[in-house]
Amino acid sequence: MATRDFVVDVAVYQSTSMSAYKHAGARQVIVKLTEGIGYFNPKASDQVKSTHDNHMYLHAYHFATFSNNAGRAKEEAKFFVSRAKKLNISKKRYLWLDWETGDGNVVINSASSNTKAIMAFMKVCKDAGYKVGLYSGAYILRQNVDTAKIIKKYGTCLWVASYATMGRIDKPDFNYFPSMDGVAMWQFTDNWCGLGVDGNITLKELITDTAKAPAKKPAKKEIAKPKTPSICYVPVLYGNPNYKVRLLDSKGHYQKYIETNTHWKVWGVKMIKGMKCYKIGTDEQWVPAKFTKIVK
């Protein structure tokens, strides 16, 4: 399973020092470099330097203003790449496209034209040698973008924003995870640890190199495999007999729902997305153990 790293994304509204974020537990930083074809974050250089000084991994993002215009998207991407090169952003890291409503960026055009423009931007960055990803809110990605097409081309590359509640959140509550395919990172709050910065958690290993020496891991101890229970019971939850529980497949993709007040034979046990799950059928039918009771 991929390492779950806390990641912060910073722009002109945040400090030039990453020390507080590092102290709170962040391991990676995404610095806003550019917007449109003329704006450069005046704090970017100092934020990049502080990220390195604090021995954190560095990525960068660009705020789109091209809407569904593929030609304009290429121009913005070239501007973004030029700035990334000037700041020596490693090609082992990600260049993210922030495509959302704001500053003239229109998202309500057809999903087809939106996707074409987004992919034109990503191609320029990819051709320049960088890893690429797409950021937006869960609703926009579901309604206004053909994410399946993007995932087919670039793999698991979505950075999705979806908050359980507004205000300070220190740790993600995966009961509110925006279930969709291709999610590499989840932005779960805009006020992580009360620091006034967006908080994100990785679901994919974004750092796959050894550019910086990783902390030594203790030797693995042999752990006895958990005994597989024979039957699990899914009780009525939250006092609502109509509440249903969503299953996952073995790779962590959400599947169909099952009724509560039901019994299931258990065929296996494994950790999926950090949750203990029971296999109650095929490899696409794993139920989170937290919603069940074991019946002997």
Where do the language-model regions lie?
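Flexible, glycine-rich phosphate/dinucleotide-binding loops
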Residues: 38, 67, 141, 167, ...
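Catalytic domains of cell-wall/extracellular-matrix polysaccharide-remodeling enzymes
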Residues: 91-173
